[in-house]
């Protein structure tokens, strides 16, 4: 009998790294709203009350970078006064010319992965599914309870037996809070208002462990407790470590950057494989060279759960999907200002996004 525990974590929108992701994607949306053909790679770093916005852009849009950053921080729930410094240059003409020659070509080389499984109705692994769900619920509760503050993290450990979900072993929730709130009250709020409404009670038992603010007091948070930078939560953004990732972050990048668009397409392919019951688990990898519109390789792994051999499933993928970069942008409609919505609680598993649709496969 093969028994093991797998753990994934998520963070709230007030986590400093996620603050930076949201600022970067809010800037991207502002550019795409005015100029859908914007090429953007504008990132953010934050520490204390200092915000640095930096990167490259090629756009006809008129963007007030500082105003977007300050509005994003305020919307998250931080009320301190912040100072913004902007260092944004024109995108290299060599890169711009390589990407924009007729049909859109890959904006960089790299490898991308997509993953799906049948552990949840969203075709996401259960540990990250519940970690995100807890983080979203924590934010919802916080917005209606002044005792809680924006920064927070969640973590869920799931026990598997022969690769089947058995139970939830451990739940960890850490939340920033007001100074005059006791840890006993925090634990009561989190257990009753965050954990119980989120978690299927059939997965919990008398041995499930709960760690709520295990370090104790958590008054100082956000950028005053830790620095933040765009692109530092790529495991939270994807599959919680359950599926592999290519290493490139998503936030800040326009869809010509295949780090983002091709990873979305790989998820679309993997999810369609599982939803069409060709496999219980599927992982798709693709690679590109800068300035080329077609991938240089792609493969699939169904981890022994496939209805057919992986070679046959790869053939089905080739007959049903087109990994041409220009096609990816068109098929998934990626030139729209949709990216701020992706920047918290994972880029995958939310049915509002085009890459979460399911394609009926012909085979």
Tell me the role of every PLM-derived stretch.
Residues 181-273:
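Glycine-rich anion/phosphate-binding loop at the beta-strand->alpha-helix junction
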Residues 1-41, 46-47, 141:
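N-terminal, positively charged regions that mediate nucleic acid binding
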Residues 42-59, 290-294:
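Short, charge-patterned binding micro-sites
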Residues 38-42, 148-158, 208-212, 278-289:
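A short glycine-rich, hydrophobically flanked beta-strand micro-motif that places a catalytic Asp/Glu
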Residues 47, 279-281, 285-363:
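Internal helix-turn-beta structural module
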Residues 13-32, 120-136, 254-277:
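Alpha-helical support elements that line or immediately flank enzyme active sites
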Residues 2, 47, 118, 239-245:
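Short connector loops/turns at beta-strand edges and beta->alpha or beta->beta junctions
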Residues 7-11, 50, 67, 74, ...:
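Glycine-rich, mobile lid/loop segments that gate access to catalytic sites or pores
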């Amino acid at each position: 009998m093969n028994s093991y525990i797998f753990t994934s974590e998520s963070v709230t929108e007030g986590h400093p790294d996620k603050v930076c992701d949201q600022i970067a994607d809010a800037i991207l949306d502002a550019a795409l709203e005015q100029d859908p053909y914007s090429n953007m790679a504008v990132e953010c770093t934050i520490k204390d009350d200092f915000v640095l916005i930096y990167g490259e852009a090629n756009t006809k849009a008129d963007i007030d970078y500082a105003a977007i950053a300050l509005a994003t921080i305020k919307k998250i729930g931080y009320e301190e006064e912040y100072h913004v410094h902007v260092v944004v240059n024109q995108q290299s003409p060599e890169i711009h010319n390589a990407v924009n020659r007729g049909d859109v070509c890959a904006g960089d080389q790299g490898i991308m992965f997509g993953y799906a499984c049948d552990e949840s109705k969203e075709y996401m692994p259960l540990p990250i599914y519940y970690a995100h769900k807890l983080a979203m619920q924590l934010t919802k509760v916080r917005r209606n309870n002044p005792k809680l503050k924006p920064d927070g993290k969640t973590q869920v450990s799931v026990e598997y037996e022969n690769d089947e979900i058995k139970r939830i072993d451990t739940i960890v929730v850490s939340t920033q809070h007001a100074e005059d709130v006791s840890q006993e009250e925090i634990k009561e709020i989190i257990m009753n208002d965050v954990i119980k409404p989120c978690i299927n009670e059939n997965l919990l038992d008398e041995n499930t462990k709960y760690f709520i603010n295990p370090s104790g007091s958590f008054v100082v948070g956000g950028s005053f407790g830790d620095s933040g930078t765009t692109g530092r939560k790529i495991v939270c953004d994807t599959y919680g470590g359950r599926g592999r990732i290519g290493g490139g972050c998503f936030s800040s990048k326009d869809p010509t950057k295949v780090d983002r668009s091709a990873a979305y397409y790989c998820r679309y392919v993997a999810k369609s494989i599982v939803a069409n019951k060709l496999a219980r688990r599927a992982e798709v990898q693709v690679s590109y060279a800068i300035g080329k519109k077609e991938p240089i390789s792609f493969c699939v792994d169904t981890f022994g759960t496939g209805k057919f051999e992986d070679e046959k499933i790869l053939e089905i993928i080739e007959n049903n999907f087109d990994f041409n970069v220009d096609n990816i942008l068109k098929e998934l409609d990626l030139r729209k200002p949709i990216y701020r919505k992706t920047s918290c609680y994972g880029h995958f598993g939310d049915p509002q996004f085009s890459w979460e649709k399911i394609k009926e496969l012909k085979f």
